[in-house]
Amino acid sequence: MAVLEEPFKGIRTVKNFIGGEWVESKGELVDIINPANQKVIGKVPMSTKDELNAAVDAAREAFPSWRRTPPLSRVRVLFRLKELMEEHFEELSRIQTVEHGKTIDESRGETRRGIENVEVATGIPSLMMGYNLEDISAGIDEYVINQPVGVFGIIPPFNFPFMVPLWFIPYAIATGNTVVLKPSPEDPTSQVKVAELAEEAGLPPGVLNLVHGGADVANAMLEHKDIQGIGFVGSTRVGRDIVYRKGGETGKRIIAGTSAKNAVLLMPDIPLDKVIPTLLSSFFGNTGQRCLAGANLIVVGEGLSERAHEEFYKKVVDQFVLSASKIKVGYGLDESVQMGPLRDKGKKARVVSFIEKGIEEGSKLMLDGRKVKLVSDLPHDAFLNPTIFSDGSVETTIGREEIFGPVANIVRARTLNDAIDMIERSPYGNASSIFTNNGGWAREVQYRVTAGNIGVNIAIPAPIAMFPFGGKKASFFGTLHPQGRDAIRFFTDTKVVIQRWM
């Protein structure tokens, strides 16, 4: 299959978008690197605190008039934005592939998921309606109204640079708020394109502002008195220890989606040949760089003798290793490629350190992804192939900590109770899945497992725009989640009006 054309040529320096103007930053410029070929494809500024303050000022000044804009008028802009995103669908997808490294199919899926959030947000004029009750006492009526809050800051991660900001932005805008977005500095260009399209769609100046930068800009957002809330997705260390705590100190509303260690349970009644392809996507899709990635594959021997369980376990390991070894790894713009690189050299080095730790702690390395094999001639700097361990446990380092790379840990559980106990010992609770044809077993997992997302014969319980998305335990900090009705509640303030006319 052909290698697709890259979405832009040369080296482009991205700008800040403040108050409806594209502004060059005075901050230091940092390279944006294509992880597949290690070429510099752009420059991103580390913006100054003054530039962040200017963006917040623009958002604050735009809020009163945007708030007074009729909801139907607000969402007409989103309808137009959705149309423009569809027109630029392929460009948006290719930008993600060259900046992040994911395959073009994965990028197209991310683009579709992001656009779906814009679509759902166009329904907010009815979704944010309040309610009322007449005559709560003689001649007295009571109303609940939902009002916009003000300026919100959005701090998304590198791994889904297009989709995750759209878990927040359309809902904030449709409900009458204004936004300051700090894209990931590693892959910011898809959000630059979104801002360009929003401007073309007729979004008024200051409603959406974009300021590039790193931790300094993020910290300034958390400390800024005029930012009313923060939407963040990233690691537990940053989400809990910095965003949630520092944001709470300044009275901000917080959504902080954080780390994960997801388990996939295989019950002995499953048709393994049908499940393996789904498992490959779960564990190695997006090169394992997603909060829904499979991490621990738990092979359950419920109802089997020890010998039969061991045979089932060996069959799973053998088939999974064989199938994973055939995954085509390379440049994501090659449509034959099934897995791209990690985002950068540092992230590869981190994953390699986990592989070495797994070996050191006694797990059996069945497939060594450090032996890089690509479909074309590319530097190996950020590439790994799928890696699989067996004969370990969920208590080892690779079984316990988030790796964020293409590494699977296959373990045994004699019973379903044992498997659930393994899951519950984890500090994380983002997602768990079970593969079975037994409704009782599936219900037991759904009922008992502490996770924000449960998959039944679905290895990736992916975020769908109509529903809230988020985890539990150390995988989430806050009370409301992005997307769906939770997002509407997060971006609105409830006011009760009790009235009597004399």
Regions found by a protein language model. Give the residues of each.
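Short, well-ordered beta-strand elements within core beta-sheets of diverse protein domains
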Residues: I41-S47, A62-R68, I154, V264-L266, ...
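Conserved C-terminal structural/oligomerization subdomain of aldehyde/semialdehyde dehydrogenase
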Residues: K39-G42, L203, I227, L265, ...
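Rossmann-like NAD(P) dinucleotide-binding subdomain of oxidoreductase/dehydrogenase enzymes
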Residues: G130-I276, H309, A413, G478
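Glycine-rich loop-to-alpha-helix module at the N-terminal edge of alpha/beta enzyme cores
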Residues: K39-M129, G139
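Hydrophobic face of amphipathic alpha-helices that form TPR/SEL1-like repeat modules
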Residues: M1-A36, R370
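A short hydrophobic/small-residue beta-strand
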Residues: T178-V180, L365, N453
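Residue-level signal for inorganic ion chemistry
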Residues: Q38, R74, Q96, V118, ...
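ALDH superfamily catalytic-core signature
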Residues: G229, R237-S393, V456, W501
